Every structure is written in structure tokens, then in C-alpha cells.
Amino acid sequence: MKDNWMKYKDDSLVASFYDSQTTTFQEQGFETELAFGTAGIRGQFGLGPGRLNRYTIQRLALGIANYLKDKEDNPSIVIHYDIRHLSSEFAHIITQILTSKGIKVYLADVYKTTPQLSFAVRYLQTSAGIMITASHNPKDYNGIKVYGADGAQLDEDTSLEVAQYINNLGNPLELNIDLNQELIEKNTFDLQEAVYDSYINEITNLIGDIPQSDLKVVYTSLHGTGVPIIPDVLKHLNFQNVSLVELQCELDPNFSSVKSANPEEREAFDLAIQQAHDLEANLIIATDPDVDRMGFVERDTNGQTYYFGGSEIGALLIKYLLEYTNVPNHSVVIQSIVSGELGKRLAQQHEVTVKEVLIGFKHIAKAIRELDDTESFLFAYEESYGYLADDFVRDKDAIQIVPLIIKYTSILKNEGKTLHDALKEIHREVGQYRDKPMSKVFEGREGQQQINALMDKLRRNIPDVIAGLKVIAVEDYETLKRNYKEDNTEEAISLPQANVIRILFKEGFIALRPSGTEPKLKFYLSLNVDNFEQVSQDIYNYIFGDTE
């Protein structure tokens, strides 16, 4: 196989990446195959069916084209791409193949964000959408995310069907690619300015007026697509007291100034915080490269900083919506099953229904789609820094949330309060819930076997008490059963299957799941206990004690 691929190296678009890789890494590209799942495909550049290159992208595009042509008489699609290496090139390859098959393509003429893609699909009423991005992954990654007509990522069944169309094509080097220049020109359309304007209008209508205050904000796009759209939104809202971290607001597919362009990582804020100290700014905001996720840090008058966790941000946004907006009757908050107790209990305290879904925003989008006529969408979030305050987009949308948190902070500042003060108010109202995502890596060939064995062991035997906390129930999302410890009764869980175990206590929950991309077991805690750090460590020791 390798010899055959080497003949195509010069035209693969990835020769320079391949040449810089270790022999072991190069070989792995020929031994694996990119798998299309609910998040599309994501991978590293290189040669072979297991890497991103011209030929694996052509295969993907042809599979999607065949799927769309079989499903509709006149299919159409929107294609956006971010600033990563080869994003633009992949977008044009996909466009040429789809248009040559008679599919109408709205192609962005410049980099765009993921939320804009979701909005554009809905606004233009296309059959599907494609976003070329790898979100916050390292620089040598890229990916193709596929969206349905509702602007949400594909569900499980549709993803499996599209994957079958792709797999039916066989070897990426032996495809019948028939590009038709006449059809390419006929079926390729520029994105109208009206799409952008309508999206901005939706956000300004959502936010309303940002009150005048002496709030100072520092913003970093972490080298991604947040500029110019975030400053443009703030300009439309007449908020001017924002300072950009110029170095990090330069487009850079290498993300040169950060170890990880991920607002979950504290290190990503270092430059912005230094600028905030220099300017005596109050709020430091970062978005990830495709601007679907965001995080923020608050700086007090003494120069002390507080990093807000993903679930804390979700709870703060719920508090803002409850206190400063007109909340309709039968409002609904949607969150993932690992997104913490704080926001959930706050919403429930105010008679807002909370619906919990599996991890992944596609499940949130499905829950939005399934709301009945009596229910009103209020807010959705995941603990991994993804939020949605209005459903004109059906994926997480940091472009909505940045001005929303600025507005909330401005209101609080005029009241002599901070976001940290608001968080303390939530704690006083519903309890001192704290959240902590943890994980353990299992290296080597045996890693996955160890993870499976650990999950099996937990499924077979969970004690009545863990780290001094009485177990109320155990939820197994593989068997879709909830077992109550006290009377040993069971009830069904009405969610799709997933390899997740959640253990419920009066004080909160812990949850475990294997990572889908790494040899890692992820571990979530959300607990209201006095000695949180000690209890967290005791639970960790119980779960992983035999593997240390």
C-alpha cells in the first residue's frame, strides 16, 4: 500500500507534513482508516487512508455527494472553513466534487466560524452544511464536520448512513473523479452578505442594550476566526471598551503563542491576563479557533484573577437569564449529563425544567428539536465551555455568549458587584457545588483493555458508600438502567446508549467515560461537600487504586 501512495505524494497537498513525521507515525497512516462519525472526521495530515490528504478528502466529498443525490432531487449545501492548514484547499476540493455532481454549493470566500455555518444552513434552507475545522486541536489536525438541514451536527443514524456511502467507494487512490468545469461554475455560489447581516441582527436582538459602565474587557481569539466577528458584534452593540490581544488576534494556523488554543486551559489566558494587568481591565475573554467555545477570567481591583469553570459559566448565564430577562412559562434548560449540579439546581429552584442529554452538542440540538409546543428553549450548555442562549443556531455559539457575559458583567459592575459575587450568590442559594474534570491515561497496547476492564469492574460492583458519601443510585448508559441502591429497584433511562457510568449521591454525582479519541478514562465530579479536594482524591483513589 505504501508504495502506491508514495506515487501520489507530490500532489497530495501534505508532502511537507509527511516529510517532517517520524517513520512510526508515517507507517500508522497506512495501517488505519479515517472513520466518519457523528462529528464527521478529524485527523492529522499525512499519507495513507488514515490521514487527511487530497485523496481522503476527495473520497469523503464523493461519498457525501452520492448520499445527497440519493436523498434529494435538488440538494444544496453551505461550506465554511477556518484558518487551519489546508482548510481553504479542502473546501475548494469538496466544492468542485459536489458541484460537478450537480449539487448547489454556497462557498464562503473567506474563513468563517462554526456558529455562522449552523446559522447559514438554517437561513439559506440548504440540505446540509460542511465546516472544515478541528476546533481546538493541535496545529497538525484538521477535520470535516457535517451538518443537517436544521443546522445541527448529524445524528447517529444519519452519520452511519453517510459513512456507508463513503466506505462503499473503497480505495481513495482509485476513485472516479469527474470534474466538470461548466457544472462547477454553474453550481458554485458566493455567500450573500445578507447571511452575515442577519446573523449579527439575531445576536443584537438577543443581547439588547449593554448598559454604560466603566467595565474594561480584554479579548483574545487565540489566533482563530473570532476576529473580526467578535469586535464587529460588540461594535454593533455600541460596546467600545474592549482591547484585543494583538499578537493572538493575528491569524496563525500554527497557534504560535499558545501551547493549546483552548479556553479550557488556563495557560491560554496568560498573554491576555498580562494585558489586563497593564490596562487594569476587569474581564478577560478567550474563544477557541472556530469560535464555538469560550471561557473567561475575572480580575478584581487588587489584581487577583479568578478562572471560571465550564459549569460555573453555565450557572452564571442561567442566573443572568433568570434575573434580567423575561423567562417564559415552561422554559427549558438543556445540559449534558456531566455538566454539573450548580446550574441544574439553580434552574430547578426557579421552576425551570432541566433536560439532561448525552455528551455532545448534537444531543442538545436533538432535544431542542423535540421540544413540544408548550415548551420554550431558554439555554443549553456543556461543561466543556460550549453554550447556546438562542436556538437560531443549533451548535454551541461563543459569538452569542461573549456579548451576553459582557452585558451581565456591566450590569453587575453598576450594582457594585462582580461575576465572582454572583457565583457566591448561586452557592448561597443552591449549595457549594464544585466541579472537577479529571482523567487518567492508559498507555500502550493494553491501555484500551485496562479502560474496558475498569468500566466492567465498576458495572459489576459499586459499594453503598464511596469516600464517605452514600450512593443513592447508579446510572449505566450502556444498559440504560438506573439502579436505586436502597431498595434495589431499577428504572429505564430514556437516552441513547453510551459507555458512561454515573453515580448519584445526595451531594451530587461522579461520572466516568472512556475518551473517544485518546487512551484516556475521563472522570467528572460535581459535589457539594465541605472538604471537596480530599473527597475528590479519595474518589479518584477508589476508582483508580488498582491501576496505580
Swiss-Prot record:
The active site is at S135 (phosphoserine intermediate). Its cofactor is Mg(2+). It comes from the Bacteria. The keyword Isomerase applies. Coiled coil: none annotated. PROSITE patterns: PGM_PMM. Mg(2+) binds at S135, D288, D290, D292. Keywords: Carbohydrate metabolism, Glucose metabolism, Isomerase, Magnesium, Metal-binding, Phosphoprotein. It catalyses: alpha-D-glucose 1-phosphate = alpha-D-glucose 6-phosphate. InterPro entries: A-D-PHexomutase_a/b/a-I, A-D-PHexomutase_a/b/a-I/II/III, A-D-PHexomutase_a/b/a-II, A-D-PHexomutase_a/b/a-III, A-D-PHexomutase_C, A-D-PHexomutase_C_sf, A-D-PHexomutase_CS, Alpha-D-phosphohexomutase_SF. One of its GO terms (biological process) is enterobacterial common antigen biosynthetic process. Pfam families: PGM_PMM_I, PGM_PMM_II, PGM_PMM_III, PGM_PMM_IV. Its EC number is 5.4.2.2. This is Phosphoglucomutase. The lineage of its organism: Bacteria, Bacillati, Bacillota, Bacilli, Bacillales.
